[in-house]
Amino acid sequence: MKLPIYLDYSATCPVDPRVAEKMMQCLTMDGLFGNPASRSHRFGWQAEEAVDLARNQVAELIGADPREIVFTSGATESNNLAIKGVAHFYAGKGKHIVTSKTEHKAVLDTCRQLEREGYEVTYLEPMPNGLFTLEQIEGALRDDTILVSIMHVNNEIGVVQNIAAIGELCRSRKILLHVDAVQSVGKIPVDVEALKVDLLSMSAHKVYGPKGIGALYVRRKPRVRLEAQMHGGGHERGMRSGTLPTHQIVGMGEAFRIAKEEMVSEGQRIMALRQRLWDGIKDIEAVYINGDLEQRVPGNLNVSFAYVEGESLIMALKDLAVSSGSACTSASLEPSYVLRALGLNDELAHSSIRFSMGRFTTEEEIDYAIKLIRDSIGRLREMSPLWEMYKDGVDLNTVEWAHH
């Protein structure tokens, strides 16, 4: 077993060796290095064929038509293209968007930008378990609502929203539904027909593919129209210009093919690892799980260890690669906005750790992690005056702290 142990699969995954192998065949003179848009020679045709195969592999994982797949530079671009693209195209119909406070920054900041352009956005607050009720979403819809954007699986707490019901509601009201499915695709079944979504964002690097490539599913029937955000040679049916990076697209296709093949067996194995980790730490005093434990993606465990400072815990767990929020916000010392939205106070939000396991995680690594966590929590709490007060029966919420 090698240290440190990687338990941050929700931030990114290593590329599967089978994927890397396929990618290497698209780079050099003796490979498929041509421009897929070059129609006048074999180098272009072969590259185009490789891209077509990958487009099919991506479509197959989510039950889509390959013509509904638009390749992008990643899910951030997919989210921007979906939300801004719809908002600008349908501005004549209305300027109201519904989303949630627990979305990824790529959705929240895109909506903030649209607010600056004169759009109105409603940000829904989740229940304490991280889920939304259909009534909540229905209550936010207005006559001028053009788009609902709700993520399938949350990147911090791993809860799975009931997208099919939301899709049914949106369709009955003739409102478009965009879903950020970065954390669900390849991990749990995603079928765009069953979920009734109109737009769906995906990323390769959360499914053991390369970074820098993603896709946006754009429904054809009934047709969803978008205003392009990237202009140029009219690639991807005019929705996203730019020379297609054959090697990255091929990598994404192969990664999605493997995910489809191994989803059930891997899901069960990873679920067992998560259960093993939780069983190993749940009897520690004052430990809380964040997000619904039933409606949850297999590889995610987000836990708050009360009376321990998150930063010091991460330092103590230096042999474990874990995070205290999303990677994108991990550099800030602010408590997680997702956990705050669930109603956690600053202290508990600060003492939370996200463990996410994946394809290369082993039982041996989990057992090592359990021992390390137990030892570290014990040691850090011994040094904590707050823990001492708690053990003495002091209600810390009633303490008046002196402010300097």
Swiss-Prot record:
An example Gene Ontology CC term for this record: L-cysteine desulfurase complex
| EC annotation from Swiss-Prot or TrEMBL | 2.8.1.7
Source species, domain of life: Bacteria
Residue runs in coiled coils: none
Ranges that cross the membrane:
none
Grouped into one coarse class, the protein's main location is: cytoplasm
**Chemical reaction(s) catalysed:** (sulfur carrier)-H + L-cysteine = (sulfur carrier)-SH + L-alanine
User: Annotated Gene Ontology MF terms?
Assistant: 2 iron, 2 sulfur cluster binding; cysteine desulfurase activity; metal ion binding; pyridoxal phosphate binding
Binding residues annotated for [2Fe-2S] cluster, in chain numbering? C328
One Pfam entry name: Aminotran_5
N6-(pyridoxal phosphate)lysine modifications at: K206
Pathway in which this enzyme or protein is active: Cofactor biosynthesis; iron-sulfur cluster biosynthesis
- UniProt subcellular location: Cytoplasm
Has keyword Iron-sulfur? yes
**Keywords per UniProt:** 2Fe-2S, Cytoplasm, Iron, Iron-sulfur, Metal-binding, Pyridoxal phosphate, Transferase
**What InterPro entries does this protein's entry cite?**
Aminotrans_V_dom, Aminotrans_V_PyrdxlP_BS, Cys_deSase_IscS, Cysteine_dSase, PyrdxlP-dep_Trfase, PyrdxlP-dep_Trfase_major, PyrdxlP-dep_Trfase_small
Residues where pyridoxal 5'-phosphate binds: A75, T76, N155, Q183, S203, A204, H205, T243
Write down the required cofactor(s).
pyridoxal 5'-phosphate
Positions of the catalytic residues? C328
Name a single GO biological process.
[2Fe-2S] cluster assembly
Protein function = Master enzyme that delivers sulfur to a number of partners involved in Fe-S cluster assembly, tRNA modification or cofactor biosynthesis. Catalyzes the removal of elemental sulfur atoms from cysteine to produce alanine. Functions as a sulfur delivery protein for Fe-S cluster synthesis onto IscU, an Fe-S scaffold assembly protein, as well as other S acceptor proteins.
Q: How does it assemble?
A: Homodimer. Forms a heterotetramer with IscU, interacts with other sulfur acceptors.
Family, per entry: Belongs to the class-V pyridoxal-phosphate-dependent aminotransferase family. NifS/IscS subfamily.
HAMAP family, alphabetized: Cys_desulf_IscS (MF_00331)
Q: What is this protein called?
A: Cysteine desulfurase IscS
